[in-house]
Amino acid sequence: MPKHGKRYRALLEKVDPNKIYTIDEAAHLVKELATAKFDETVEVHAKLGIDPRRSDQNVRGTVSLPHGLGKQVRVLAIAKGEKIKEAEEAGADYVGGEEIIQKILDGWMDFDAVVATPDVMGAVGSKLGRILGPRGLLPNPKAGTVGFNIGEIIREIKAGRIEFRNDKTGAIHAPVGKASFPPEKLADNIRAFIRALEAHKPEGAKGTFLRSVYVTTTMGPSVRINPHS
């Protein structure tokens, strides 16, 4: 195991490893644990009672956090015709069609989210799949990033909508705000994310769905929480 520095060990002493904290307690505690010189991201890590090898048990969805993420999300919209203007008016940072696909093929990646209309997905998938797919940026209807209602999609992402999906170990990791948020807003965002997770419980999943849930900051130790508190 890697050795942690003195700062981390001091923070670890503030966390009771045998206690399962309420969401409100954790929201206050993680603010104390965020001592880095930058505004740390607060994340939720959940271990799910699913078999990730089975496609019918994979969990994937989106949730609009009530207080956003506390950061500006750079949205790229790929569309054509009238939808280009709609995307621009909705606040997309970059909008284009074939020319922007070529720009990405040339190495440009200055964006955080990609949305597209269905009529361009053939080109997007075939040309950009290998580039955007591994980065989790490829537009997908299940993730709510493909649709002719592209203006609505962009506004939701800008307001703090996040995508979540389990990894190959059956765990999910998602940002829920910044350490600078008031604890009440962090707690609201955590609860909204947990409700969204539970709404996506697969029918075939047996036993306890949320096996363990932790809240952590970018550089701090994790705090186990009761997801129903």
From Swiss-Prot:
<dbReference type="InterPro" id="IPR028364">
    <property type="entry name" value="Ribosomal_uL1/biogenesis"/>
</dbReference>
<keyword id="KW-0678">Repressor</keyword>
<dbReference type="GO" id="GO:0000049">
    <property type="term" value="F:tRNA binding"/>
</dbReference>
<protein>
    <recommendedName>
        <fullName>Large ribosomal subunit protein uL1</fullName>
    </recommendedName>
</protein>
<keyword id="KW-0687">Ribonucleoprotein</keyword>
<dbReference type="GO" id="GO:0003735">
    <property type="term" value="F:structural constituent of ribosome"/>
</dbReference>
<dbReference type="InterPro" id="IPR023674">
    <property type="entry name" value="Ribosomal_uL1-like"/>
</dbReference>
<comment type="function">
    <text>The L1 stalk is quite mobile in the ribosome, and is involved in E site tRNA release. Binds directly to 23S rRNA.</text>
</comment>
<keyword id="KW-0694">RNA-binding</keyword>
<dbReference type="InterPro" id="IPR005878">
    <property type="entry name" value="Ribosom_uL1_bac-type"/>
</dbReference>
<dbReference type="GO" id="GO:0015934">
    <property type="term" value="C:large ribosomal subunit"/>
</dbReference>
<dbReference type="Pfam" id="PF00687">
    <property type="entry name" value="Ribosomal_L1"/>
</dbReference>
<dbReference type="GO" id="GO:0006412">
    <property type="term" value="P:translation"/>
</dbReference>
<dbReference type="InterPro" id="IPR023673">
    <property type="entry name" value="Ribosomal_uL1_CS"/>
</dbReference>
<keyword id="KW-0820">tRNA-binding</keyword>
<dbReference type="GO" id="GO:0019843">
    <property type="term" value="F:rRNA binding"/>
</dbReference>
<keyword id="KW-0810">Translation regulation</keyword>
<comment type="function">
    <text>Protein L1 is also a translational repressor protein, it controls the translation of the L11 operon by binding to its mRNA.</text>
</comment>
<comment type="similarity">
    <text>Belongs to the universal ribosomal protein uL1 family.</text>
</comment>
<keyword id="KW-0699">rRNA-binding</keyword>
<dbReference type="InterPro" id="IPR016095">
    <property type="entry name" value="Ribosomal_uL1_3-a/b-sand"/>
</dbReference>
<keyword id="KW-0689">Ribosomal protein</keyword>
<dbReference type="GO" id="GO:0006417">
    <property type="term" value="P:regulation of translation"/>
</dbReference>
<dbReference type="InterPro" id="IPR002143">
    <property type="entry name" value="Ribosomal_uL1"/>
</dbReference>
<comment type="subunit">
    <text>Part of the 50S ribosomal subunit.</text>
</comment>
